[in-house]
Regions:
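N-terminal strand-loop element at the rim of the active site
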Residues: 4-7, 14-20, 33-71, 157-165
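An aromatic- and histidine-rich active-site surface loop
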Residues: 74-87, 92-120, 285
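Aromatic "clamp/platform" in nucleotide-sugar-dependent glycosyltransferases that forms part
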Residues: 281-282
Length: 360
């Protein structure tokens, strides 16, 4: 009887696990552990600055630490140092994001590992990046796509972009979202709603980072002209854009602006009982918050871009401006069951974990 060889896989490019927040951190959290096959042995590179508890193992994965921050100006050296430390001893290196991929030609030169890069959501196109940062991210993306053995796109729109711009084929592996189904009882659910002054089907909901590319201003402008109630969760003190919106709209009786919430029980109760979920993102590939919302079977109103259409399999309802959104919230379409069906078929972490393992 032959035993299958255990594959050693290094994951780098995230803050690390346990996940506090962030799409890639949540991805790692859910492809290791109970969703991981017995013949895969993960090592996750973590930031010692961001993860001060410095656990040695987590959910069966080995944790190694780099003494730099994973985000901001240190993200590039953080990724490069991580790559240098995993040149030997791994069958596969999974890199999440492209910021350090200028080092990829050297990694290919000195390592025999299979290199897989998830290029995320075309970071260089985000409005928040300007000048040399934008050019650097575009160059890093180019290095990633040209030098990795396998490129992962989490959305068909990203896959089409890679084919059109680089004449390369990317593997489509989506994002999971069923970790948000925490299964709280009805009594706790009602308690949470009462805590926030909410009633089932009595409010619409949105959740995101408060940035221009997430079109928060469109949702707020629409609800300022409507009698419908909006619960909008985000980091309202993070930047000039968010602070300006908070100052402008916090006086409306039907608009409640809540600071970021990470408690899955609270989010479960809010998502499950909202009248509809509004998703304004216009950048990136598959947005985790959209996938998560789809699992609750509530109607989705999404900004009309290819990534959101692909994520929802063209079964949500879409808007391009305040006028179109105002029309939708005045008469919310019933697409919730379709959203739940798509989510349970394509966006479970068990499915996503197997898709990744097939590439190792």
């Amino acid at each position: 009887m032959h035993t299958r060889k255990v594959k050693k896989v290094a994951i780098l490019g995230t803050q690390g696990v346990p996940a506090n927040y962030g799409g890639f951190e949540t991805l790692v959290e859910n492809i290791i552990g109970e969703n991981c096959s017995n013949d895969i042995r993960y090592t996750v590179f973590c930031s010692a600055k961001d993860m001060p508890q410095r656990m040695k193992e987590y959910k069966g994965a080995i944790l190694k630490y780099v003494n730099l921050r994973a985000n901001g100006v240190q993200s590039i050296p953080y990724d490069i140092v991580s790559m240098m430390r995993c040149m030997r001893g791994y069958d596969t290196i999974l890199i999440l994001g492209v910021s350090g991929c200028i080092f990829l030609p050297f990694l290919r030169l000195f390592s025999r590992s299979r290199i897989i890069v998830n290029i995320d959501g075309l970071e260089h196109r985000r409005a928040k990046w300007k000048g040399w940062v934008k050019r650097f991210l575009k160059m890093s993306e180019s290095f990633a796509i040209r030098h990795a053995h396998t490129i992962i796109a989490d959305n068909r729109g990203i896959q089409d972009y890679v084919r059109h711009v680089y004449d390369k084929d990317a593997k489509l592996v989506t994002y999971g979202g069923d970790h948000v189904l925490v299964g709280i009882d009805k009594e706790r659910e009602i308690e949470i709603l009462e805590q926030y002054g909410l009633e089932p089907d009595g409010y619409c909901m949105s959740l995101c980072r408060i940035e221009p590319e997430n079109n928060c201003h469109i949702a707020l402008e629409a609800f300022a002209k409507s009698k419908e109630k909006l619960i909008f969760i985000g980091n309202w003190k993070a930047n000039g854009y968010s602070r300006k919106l908070k100052e402008q709209y916090s006086g409306y009786d039907n608009i409640k602006l809540l600071d970021s919430i990470y408690d899955l029980e609270i989010l479960h109760a809010m998502r499950k009982n909202c009248k509809c979920y509004i998703h304004g993102h216009c950048a990136g590939g598959t947005n985790p918050s959209l996938v998560e919302a789809m699992f609750f079977g509530r109607p989705i109103l999404a900004f009309n871009i290819v990534y959101n259409r692909e994520t929802t399999h063209h079964k949500a309802n879409y808007y391009q401006n305040c006028k179109e959104l105002l029309k939708l919230i005045g008469r919310v379409p019933d697409n919730g069951k379709k959203m739940s069906k798509v989510a349970h078929r394509y966006y479970t972490w068990k499915h996503v974990a197997k898709e990744y393992e097939a590439l190792y």
